[in-house]
Structure formats: C-alpha cells, structure tokens
Amino acid sequence: CRFWEPKTGARLGIVFEETVVDATAIDPRGCADISTWLALPDPIEYMRGITELAERSKNRLHIRELEHAPAPGSRHLLPPIDKQEIWGAGVTYQRMRQSHVDESHGGKLFYDEVYDAARPELFFKTTPHRVAGPFGSIRVRSDSEWTIPEPELTVLLSPAQRIIGFT
C-alpha cells in the first residue's frame, strides 16, 4: 500500500492481515516510491526480500490508523500509484452494455463496435494527481445526471511491460 506519514511524506507499506510495515523505512532507495520499485530489474523478487525483512519487523501500524479521509497532519492511505498514467480497456462487462448505450444518447454503434471488437478498446483515463485515494472525495461533473458504478480489474505493469500484479 501507499500511505502518508506526516513527518516524512509518502511511504510504501507491506500489509500483513491488519497491520502495515513501512517498507520505505526498510529500504529508502528501492522503496522510495512505486515508480522506483517498478523500475528495478526484478521488482517481484526484490519485494519478496523486503517482505521477508518486514515479516520480522516489530514496528507495525494497525491498518485502522490509516483508514480515514486524507488530512496532511495525520497518517492515511494514498492512491496505489505515484507517477503512472491510468489507462482503461474497453467496455468489458456484457451487463453494462445497455447502460453505456443509454448513457451515451445514440452511442449504440460505438459501443457495439467496442463489445464486438477482436481486442479491447484502450483509452486514456487520467493522470495520477487526479486519482482519488481510499476515503478521498471524487468529483462528478455538474451536468451529470447519473453515474454507473463498475467493477474494475487493475493490472500493474513495470516499465519493461512485465505484469507485476493485479487487483
């Protein structure tokens, strides 16, 4: 996870059930931020080593200490990205197809093509500074009459285009 420590700023953490160990405290260079970690030659193997060290750490936070709205003077969870762009892959849930057609007012042809395409439609979503973290506020356009909640699969890629993880 990423979390905010008021005295030191953004940190990477390793979650063990209901506790969090500060990985940045274990290795300030390799765990400086997500971008630094992803750029390592083998981020997965590196994190295995950090996790072994973290398992022995007595210095733990309870996850509840981080689970509240962001505030500069208190510890809180941050979005799980730092410098990465966010991209989406098509309209992938068949169940959402009609909702998207209805919402787009005449976008039937576009959404039919997205659903029936040989590969998913890739589209740019946002930059990191626009991402709301856990317990953060989201912005909805004032002219929006409704919002469609959708489940999402997130895939984390390294700069070398290796799949590092997913949620």
Label each residue range with its predicted role.
Residues 45-167:
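Active-site microenvironments in enzyme catalytic cores
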Residues 1-43, 48:
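Gly/serine-rich nucleotide phosphate-binding loop at the start of the catalytic core
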